[in-house]
Amino acid sequence: MINIDIYQHFRQEEYELIDQLTDKCDQVEQHYAPVLTHFLDPRGQYILEVICGSYEDLNVSFYGGPNAERKRAIISSNYYEPKESDFELTLMEIEYPEKFVTLKHQHILGTLMSLGIEREQVGDIIVNERIQFVLTSRLESFIMLELQRIKGASVKLYTIPVTDMIQSNENWKNESATVSSLRLDVVIKEMIRKSRTIAKQLIEKKRVKVNHTIVDSADFQLQANDLISIQGFGRAHITDLGGKTKKDKTHITYRTLFK
C-alpha cells in the first residue's frame, strides 16, 4: 500500500494519475500478475518509478520503441522479466503524396484525436523523411480501417516491426544552470536567455505548456522531468534538479530543442 506522504512530493493536478498508477501497483501486489499501463511521458514515468519504489517487491520496466520518449510501463514482481512483445506496441508507417502535402506532428496527432483516440493510447510520432507513429496494439485494426486521410490527403498505413522505428533527427542540446527558484518564469528566463518580463508575458499569453497543459501562472513550480513547450522558441526537458549553492540557488540540468 502506498504511503499517503507520497502525495506531498507531487502537484495536485497529478493526484489522479498517481491514484491510477497506485491502483495498478496494488493489483500486482495482491495478485502477483504483471500489469501494463498506457503510454506515459517522462514526467509520468518518473511518478511511476517513485510510486513503485514505495512498494517492497515491485519492479517497473518501460518501453515505447528504440529511444522513445513516450513509453508504456509493465509493473511486476521483481522476478518477472518482460519481453518487448509484452508491451503490446504497434508501429505504423504512413505513405502519403509528399509532393502535394506537408505533414507535421500536429497533423498526425490531430487526426488521431479526431478519430476518438485518446492521447494516452499513442506513443511517439516521428516526422522525418518518413512518418511513423506508435500506438497500443489493440487499436491496430481500428486505425487501419478508419485512418484514410490526413490534412485532406489520401494516405496508406503499413504495420512494421517496432525494431524498425526510425530515429528522430531532433538535435537536443544539453545545458545546465543555477536559478534563484523553480518558478516557471525564472526557469524560462534562463532557458530562452531573455528578460523575466518577456518570460512572464509568454506565460500570461498562454504560450507556455508544462507536460502538454497550458500554464498561465508565472509562479508555477517546476519539478524534475517536466516537459516545457514555449511557443515561438521550442521545447525543453528538465532532466535533473541538483542541490543548493551557498547563495541558496538551485542547480538544474535540462535539454532544449529550440528553433
Model-derived features: positions:
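Ferredoxin-like alpha/beta domains used as RNA- or RNAP-binding modules
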Residues: 1-185, 191, 234-259
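A basic, amphipathic helix-loop patch mediating RNA/tRNA/ribosome contacts
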Residues: 175-224, 241
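Charge-rich, low-complexity terminal tails
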Residues: 223-226, 255-257
